């Protein structure tokens, strides 16, 4: 089953708290993942904070259309102890 992002909150820097539909939750640090033309605007922290959870794509999306596959986010998830 493909994981679905159901909630995301800004934590700090390039870190988001993400909750998945299967109950998994934790933090994802995007700092090393922001590469390429579509992701370049995300280097600006105020812009990075301006995301939403797209209910059709089931992932985090920014205004310019940049997104990360939910499977990728699931793999990068750092579960909080």
What residue spans do the PLM features occupy?
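Motif-centric detector for short Cys/His coordination patterns
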Residues: 1-81
């Amino acid at each position: 089953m493909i994981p679905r992002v159901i909630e995301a909150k800004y934590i700090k820097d390039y870190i988001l708290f993400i909750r998945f539909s299967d109950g998994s939750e934790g933090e994802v640090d995007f700092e090393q993942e922001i590469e390429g033309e579509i992701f370049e605007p995300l280097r600006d922290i105020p812009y990075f904070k301006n995301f939403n959870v797209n209910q059709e794509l089931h992932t985090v999306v920014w205004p310019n259309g940049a997104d990360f596959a939910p499977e990728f986010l699931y793999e990068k998830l750092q579960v909080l102890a």
